[in-house]
Amino acid sequence: MSSTLSEGQTLIKKSLSPSKATSTNNKGHVFVEPQTPLKNSNKASTSEAALPETLKIMGPLTTPTKVLDAPSSDPWTPTSNLKMLISAASPEIRNREKERAVDSSESENSQETEQGEEVEKLHISRKDKSLGLLCYKFLARYPNYPNPALNNGISLDDVAAELHVERRRIYDIMNVLESLNMVSRLAKNRYTWHGRVKLAQTLAVLKRAGKENRYEQLMQQIRQRSQEREEREFDLDGEEKENEEMSSFEVDGDSGLADLPGADSKAASANSRKDKSLRVMSQKFVMLFLVSSPPVVSLDVAAKILIGEDHVVDQDKNKFKTKIRRLYDIANVLSSLELIKKVHVTEDKGRKPAFKWTGPEDIPSPKDLEISTTSSAPKPLESRSSVENCAKNLFSSPGTKRGFTRHHSLVKLVKSIQDDRRKINSAPSSPIKMTGDSADSDFYTTKMAHLAAICKKHLDEQSADGRPNNAVTDSSQSSKQPESTSASNHGPPGMQIPVLPAGAISYLPTKCSPIIPLLIPQHQTGGPYAVYMHPTSLRPQPTSLAVRSMTFESPVGANAKTSPATLTSNNQTNQSSSYGKEQTSPVNLKRASGEKSSVGSPSKMQRTEPKSVSPKLCEILQARLKARRGALTSNRPSARALHLEFSKPSESQPTVQTGTASLEHSLETFLEKEEKSQTSDNEAGLTPVRQPHSQPQKLSAPFQDMVLPSGPIHTETLIPAGYLIPISQQSIVNFREPQCSNESSKASTPTYNIYHTPTAGSRPAFPQEVTPTRLPLHRIPPISPFPSHGHRLHSPSPAILNFTLQNLGLIPGSVTPNPHTPEQSSSLQSPHPGLPHQGMIFVKPMSPARALQQTSIHGQPVTLISIPQALVTTPKGGQAFQQSFFHTPVSFPTVNTTAPKKIYIPQRKLDVSPEEI
């Protein structure tokens, strides 16, 4: 601090010395500095040489005079010294302050100049940015009729920069031009210029749309209402009526929007944003000029029609004024295009702004313009791709972006598809249980709705395997369709089954159908089959010399000469009296509806006069059959078919001789007749028939051991008219019946249960018990029409079989049989062993494990199980009348009983087991 003060004092002394000198000079007192003698001459010479220089600088060397009593302006105080010190120590601070002052002054001047320039700019842009002037400048950049071969693209960014305006102002111009098809949108901020090339066509379309929307009538009504409103300003009722009328004439967006390029069909309603866009309002505004008779439209009328918010004027005036400004923008652009001009309309309250149409007045129809443009206009689009040429409207342009609109119905379609897919995905998908043969072979479902389709599919697969159907007679070739309806029936109950040569099982019906029956060939899969047999009540009257026989074919050579037994009908002299009795018996009812269905069926052959058939005709048919048989036996594979052969009685063939016994023939009588036929079997080279070693009277279901010949099997297949229905292994169930009081010595073994269809009779049928094993079976006599034990049966159920057979036309929908007398009902209790008069046959191929190769039918013997159907009977004594009810079959509880004596039955044989009722 001391050093600083000393320096400050020296500076003060230096600064004060010149002031003292001046003061002394002014007063005349001069101070002279004393001179000292020079010791050295050298020094003196040196000082003398430097003296003139110092004189020049310091002036004359005179001693200053001392100023006496000189008053000081500032007192010497510590504060003054401090001020002097601060001012001397901070010269740079003073410079900075001066610089800041200069900068602030310059900035103020610059701000004033900038504000002035901005004011000038705002004043200029307000004038230059008017939409009409901008539209004039914009149209001056492009020709009215451009060359389509050149690039006529427009970039809004470049145009806004060149015109020194905002891009939003250019958007207003482009929307109005796009509504008139003078430009088309290519991309964002990219447009294509078309000019006035399509202006006439656009105006024609707009004029047609305006007429369709009744704009002219609407304008007249608005003018009339406005005049009435002026007269009744204070009438509230008049205003309400006006609002109602206005609402009835409001135009929605779809009708007001013309089908123009860029006029998107998605502009839906009058309240939508798209409908009130500048482009759509511009189209409607032009429509008003084109349809009005004096082409002058006031702005308020146009606002009421286009904006459609006249009733909201009092509620929101600012909103309505904003939309009025949009109409002004449209009018300014149209004025720049020289289509309209502004005028004033004088009314009662004064002048109102209006616009008059100055554009083309004679506008042709759109069709004429289309014809002229297609014939004369150049075609620059031919070189472009087909996608670009596919436009959604009349005004397609080269290079424009195509916008395809999704129709609203597609949205509903997509929703419905999604709902269906959701239902399918949410449906239960439990696996199907497949057991036994169903997993290995063709699986047949147990559902009723699919059984008929599965049977048809099975037949189609058989035909697709390349196995040709076995040919039948010439008369049966025209009737190969499997439409054997209820007219294809067979014999009555009590008929016998004699053993015939050539391994053919011949059924001798007394009442035969004149129609040729046909059994559908089935695919040989080893599975069981159910053969449906038609009821007696639907069978037609028999014809003479008609014989049906059944066999299962096997490939034989052309030298097969054996033929099935030819049997005569009941009009021959050697026919048994029992059959004659059966023919005249009232049990054999006349057909009810079979004859009608057979007459109208073109796929069947009918003989009009059955009794007039002569043996000569039968010989001709038999000769033709034999001639065709020799040609077809070599190339026919093993398939099952049904053939009909007409023949006369042969002397070499044995005839069946029966007495006048009743229908209650015993099995012994039947076996005795079979022994008589063994002689003919030996002559034909057949294996003798083996009788079962048991008492047939004790068997409820007797069996017949039918051994087929060891030689070639005959190719003729004859069976009573029926159908083979494939049955899966699920339908084969095992059950045991409880022991009966009167049949306690009989045992129950696993059996196959087949149930008849409840269509022919009114009483419930009972299960048929047949087994291919060596154990006999017994049956409990029925106590009540309701089964006391359930049957376990998976497939097929009687309802399924009824459904399938009725759909295929095999059985009628409902049959009401005629009642019988007690004598007639008693005759049905024990029919003769043979094919029953009605019911179903269950065909079960047996296992080919045994070595009886001569009995195999393509390696698989069959077992015929017939289920008769009962008819309505008159109750005897105190028996209650039994009604027919359908019960779902379920399984019986098993009961172990005493097994009777076993009967040896060869496995490879053909067993026919009737049932006693």
Curated annotation (Swiss-Prot):
Domain of life: Eukaryota
DNA-binding region boundaries: 126-195, 273-359
Biased composition (Basic and acidic residues): 93-103
Amino acid composition bias (Polar residues), ranges on this chain: 16-27, 37-48, 371-386, 595-605, 815-830
Classification via Pfam families: E2F_TDP
Stated role: Atypical E2F transcription factor that participates in various processes such as angiogenesis and polyploidization of specialized cells. Mainly acts as a transcription repressor that binds DNA independently of DP proteins and specifically recognizes the E2 recognition site 5'-TTTC[CG]CGC-3'. Directly represses transcription of classical E2F transcription factors such as e2f1. Acts as a regulator of S-phase by recognizing and binding the E2-related site 5'-TTCCCGCC-3' and mediating repression of G1/S-regulated genes.
Family statement drawn from the similarity comment of this UniProt entry: Belongs to the E2F/DP family.
Protein name per its UniProtKB record: Transcription factor E2F8
Organism: Danio rerio (Zebrafish)
Classification lineage: Eukaryota, Metazoa, Chordata, Craniata, Vertebrata
